[in-house]
Amino acid sequence: MKVNDRVTVKTDGGPRREGVVLEVEEFSEGVMYLVSLADYPAGVWFFNEVDSQDGTFVGPLSQ
């Protein structure tokens, strides 16, 4: 996923939320995405771990 991609994010206790990627930072353990959400337009950071399905919080928006 890259900047300006539409994505969904997993948050605590609720359905996946739609947003837009503002920034991407890669690390050896995974990738951090700054995602703009309706109630957080400046963005919230989410981290996707490399080798963990449970640690995947950002995914592409299914069309």
UniProtKB/Swiss-Prot annotation:
Q: What Pfam families does the record point to?
A: DSRB
Q: Where are the transmembrane segments?
A: none
Q: Which domain of life is it from?
A: Bacteria
Family according to the record: Belongs to the DsrB family.
Protein known as: Protein DsrB
Q: Which organism is it from?
A: Yersinia pseudotuberculosis serotype O:3 (strain YPIII)
Its gene is dsrB
